[in-house]
Amino acid sequence: MGQIKSVLFDLGNVLAVIDFYKFWSSLGFLRPEEIAPFTDGYISWTRQFESGFVSTNEYLTGLHSVFGRSFSVEQLERAFASIIREPIDGMMEVVKRVSREHRTALVSNTNEIHYKISLDKLDVLGVLPTHYLSYKMRVMKPAQGFYNAIIDDQKIDPSEMLFIDDIPENVNAAKSAGMQAICFEGVEKLNTSLKGFLGSL
């Protein structure tokens, strides 16, 4: 097991609260049966958007069609942007502390709309010098290509990287790529885990 040189932080529900339901409620959909007819189209377009296969304009136009043109493109963009909520308390301090002695980076399945909103709302992103973004890399976690691209760019052994994510599937994929990894379950548990990997901070 290599000594940790680089710590990689996920964005959603690690650095910031993400509320996927906010998209639907912002458009007035409050019950599962109201949402269900549009779910497949929404998920399909969003995966293409976060994989970098469609532009922001193409994505919003696609959603416009999914919803039968019931909402304006502007309404859809505002609703989609509203998914990004507040910073998670305590994570700025964690990132700053880790950054004193380790390389740090953002690793996120995201898109142009959410990334721009996050830059405006989340000061912690300014502390992370490198941002690995699925829509720019054209590959999403948990595909091995996502992790391999990071390993190639970091130019260190994957065992010297510590990957932090709230989704077990993404954490397991990082381990399969040779990285060390933590499944995020809150700041207190993360601090305990970090001491085990990094020693005193």
Regions flagged by a language model, labelled:
Residues 158-194:
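Acidic, Mg2+-coordinating phosphoryl-transfer loop and its flanking beta/alpha structural elements
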Residues 10-13, 52, 98, 106, ...:
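Generic structural signal for small/hydrophobic residues in well-ordered secondary structure
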Residues 6, 140-168:
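Conserved Lys-Pro-Asp/Glu-containing loop-to-beta segment of HAD-superfamily phosphomonoesterases
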Residues 14-15, 20-22, 110-113, 137-138, ...:
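Short, solvent-exposed loop/turn segments at secondary-structure junctions
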